[in-house]
Amino acid sequence: MNQELERLEERCLSSELIFDGKVVHLYVDRVSLPDGQSSIREYVKHIGAVAVLPLTDEGEVICVRQYRYAHRCLLTEIPAGKLDRSDEDHVEAALRELREETGATCRTLTHLGLYRSTPAILDEKVDLYFAEGLTFGETDPDDDEFLEVHRIPLSTMVEMVMRGEITDGKTQVAVLKVNEILRRRAQDSENAKG
């Protein structure tokens, strides 16, 4: 076992399901700490999710604006959604969310990595993707999903992130990663020219 993990790992002594909801499941666990003491950990289990940053050939991000009840405000976000099943293919889920929320399909889908939204209390993992070569059709949001689709230049989105106007974490991470990918592509293209 990794020595660092051995020094820092907390081991579960007991686990109790407190709330078993449709989307989340709340647990209270008693854990053994690395120094031998015990403590309580409250956490939420979540099936996982995907998020997609769709970029047009003109450099615009297709994003959605929707009311988030838990925060009681409107947020600008990239298309995203929870997995329908724990064994659902994440690429298929990303393509589904892209189509449902924006009406788009893509020629290229690049995995940007894994994002853990709130690791102290939530085990949700969000796989982030970058969609290019977009073709547009009709949106098909879920019955309880009300959102507006917007096109915002990537450079503007970067500035919105830096000014604190975009507060959704997955969107911040995806915007900054895609911006860096495009910067490196441009640099590689310049270097190839000589």
Model feature map: region roles:
Residues 12, 26-28, 40, 64, ...:
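Hydrophobic residues on conserved beta-strands that form the core of alpha/beta folds
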Residues 39, 48-51, 56, 82-169:
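Unchanged
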Residues 2, 6-7, 41, 51-96:
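Conserved Nudix-box catalytic region and its N-terminal flanking loop in Nudix hydrolases
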Residues 15, 64-66, 114:
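Residue-level detector of high-confidence beta-strand sites
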Residues 25-29, 74, 125-127, 148:
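Short beta-strand micro-motifs in enzyme catalytic cores
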Residues 2-13, 37, 126, 144-194:
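Nudix hydrolase/Nudix homology domain
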Residues 14-51, 57:
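Acidic, metal-coordinating catalytic segment for phosphate/diphosphate chemistry
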